[in-house]
């Protein structure tokens, strides 16, 4: 339950969201990760009911030429607040993974090409998941311990900064 505290009150800043058939109550961390180094450059913490695509423009630094994301970011380039060009005036390409149901259209050959492209996108996007793996696995951060968005932001800023230190200390796997 979301009210396991002394006051028997819910956190006013946290919200519920349904993912699949499972309900979650709390917060969501949206992160921007550098494609080459795998280090976090941006962290935004919101209530769990805030959709990923609404945070896209807040996660970009302005230096990007390509943006990768999971299917939660579909349509990010079409939004009013979308950043279309970076600081140097170059067009930003959005490479967002499709939903599995969208990959069933077309011939077998086109499906094979589509599957290969989606795999390439996922291999770059996996660097984001590695960061969450460090925070959840190494630091055992699986649920919130504090009430209030400000406390969550402080806690997650510390955890993701420590994750950056750990990831920066590891030898580069791509080389």
Residue ranges: model-predicted function:
Residues 61, 65-66, 71-150, 154:
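Helix-centered, glycine/charged polyanion-binding patches within enzymatic domains
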Residues 6-14, 20-21, 30, 97, ...:
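Residue-level detector of intrinsically disordered/flexible regions characterized by low predicted structural confidence
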Residues 157-160, 164-175:
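C-terminal domain-tail junction helix/linker
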Residues 1-85, 90, 157-163:
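Polybasic low-complexity intrinsically disordered regions
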Residues 45, 146-149, 172-175:
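Composition- and surface-driven signal marking solvent-exposed, interaction-prone regions
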Residues 16-17, 101-105, 171-175:
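Short, surface-exposed, charge-dense and proline/glycine-enriched linear segments
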């Amino acid at each position: 339950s979301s009210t396991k505290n002394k006051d028997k009150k819910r956190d006013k800043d946290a919200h519920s969201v349904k993912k699949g058939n499972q309900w979650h109550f709390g917060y969501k961390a949206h992160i921007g990760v550098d494609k080459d180094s795998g280090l976090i450059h941006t962290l935004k913490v919101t209530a769990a009911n805030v959709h990923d695509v609404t945070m896209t423009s807040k996660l970009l630094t302005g230096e990007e030429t390509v943006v990768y994301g999971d299917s939660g970011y579909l349509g990010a380039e079409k939004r009013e607040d979308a950043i279309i060009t970076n600081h140097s005036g170059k067009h930003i390409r959005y490479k967002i993974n499709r939903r599995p149901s969208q990959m069933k259209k077309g011939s077998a050959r086109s499906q094979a090409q589509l599957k290969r492209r989606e795999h390439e996108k996922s291999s770059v996007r996996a660097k984001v998941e590695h960061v969450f793996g460090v925070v959840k696995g190494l630091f055992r951060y699986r649920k919130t311990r504090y009430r209030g968005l400000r406390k969550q932001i402080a806690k997650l800023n510390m955890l993701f900064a420590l994750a950056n230190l750990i990831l920066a200390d590891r030898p580069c796997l791509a080389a």
